[in-house]
Amino acid sequence: MVKGIGHAAFNVKDMGRSIAFYENTMGFKKAFSIKRPETGEPWIEYIYAGGDQFIELFYGGTNEIPYSDENIGFFHMCVEVDDILEAWKRIVDTDAPQDDAPKQGVDFNWQCWTHDPDGNKIELMQLSEDGPQMKFVKSLESLE
């Protein structure tokens, strides 16, 4: 049975800069590193994202793909927060990209946007009790 999403993985150009972003701006913690078994060189940095979830950062990214809303494939990652204004303040205070300031979406949830050093779009979302996501989760809880 599926338990959830275990991780999202990204190739990164500058590991130090990426780790600093995910720790300082996003508030995650670096968990551990994995080295290449055949060479002992750094390979993957694991960022703890809460629960059983991680973000994998792979060394050696070189080919940038220009972002477009029309691209097929990865579109953005959403991070759930408990206070959207506090999350936005952290983005501003760390001089991270301020793509979209906090606003309430059509789904009644609060959202703001940034992107990581490699241009991966990140939505931060404070779920509303009136939003379809929370209503669905509550409906599942009532079945237990």
Question: Model-derived features: where do they sit?
Answer:
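N-terminal beta-strand motif that seeds the catalytic metal site of vicinal oxygen chelate
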Residues: 1-17, 74-79, 128-144
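Core segments of cupin and vicinal oxygen chelate
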Residues: 2, 9-54
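Vicinal oxygen chelate
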Residues: 4-13, 43-49, 65-144, ...
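Hydrophobic side chains in well-ordered alpha-helices
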Residues: 18-21, 87-91
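A short, acidic/glycine-rich surface segment
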Residues: 32-33, 41-42, 62-67, 100, ...
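Short hydrophobic-acidic sequence motifs that mark active-site Asp/Glu residues
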Residues: 54-56, 121
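Acetyl-CoA-dependent GNAT
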Residues: 59-63, 126-127
